[in-house]
Amino acid sequence: KLLTWEDVIASNYKETVANPASGDVQIWEITNKSGGWFHPVHIHLVDFKMLTRNGKPVFSYEQGPKDVTFVGENETIRAIMRFGTAGDPTTDGRYMIHCHNLPHEDHDMMTQFRVGNDVDRDPAYGPDDPQNANCNDPINADPAGASPA
């Protein structure tokens, strides 16, 4: 059966790992403690800028905008991201974070975060929706040029 957004709403699954407001800039830390596995982690809605890998500067090929990052065994990455534009309600809703290793994804290695307060808003927008123009600006966020202390 093909699952739809209505199925997600009907499941009443509302647990989230973060709840930024529209326009917030946050630094997230992702740690892989899985013991022998690597995880290409995909964060929906945003492009982000990696700040560090295991407390050290990222590799040159990791310095551009990302929506997926490789997190190897016992690694920790820090990334900065902006969640849409402040005051823009089209960004509000729930978004997925998941592993792009298909066996992991198929066995529920995923969770969600919520932007704003509209938890039931369908995040599947058309190509002309203003959200698509507003959500990819982490590079210009003030702290993006410097590593955090």
Where are these predicted regions, by residue range?
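Edge beta-strand plus adjacent loop/short-helix module at the start
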Residues: 1-85, 117, 128-149
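Residue-level detector of short, conserved catalytic/binding motifs and their immediate flanks
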Residues: 26, 39, 93, 97, ...
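Beta-strand-rich extracellular modules
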Residues: 31-33, 100-104
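Short glycine/serine/proline-enriched coil/turn segments at secondary-structure junctions
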Residues: 35, 88-89, 105
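Hydrophobic alpha-helical membrane-insertion segments
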Residues: 53, 107-109
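Short glycine/proline/serine/threonine-rich loop/turn segments at secondary-structure transition edges
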Residues: 85-95
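Short beta-strand elements
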Residues: 109-121
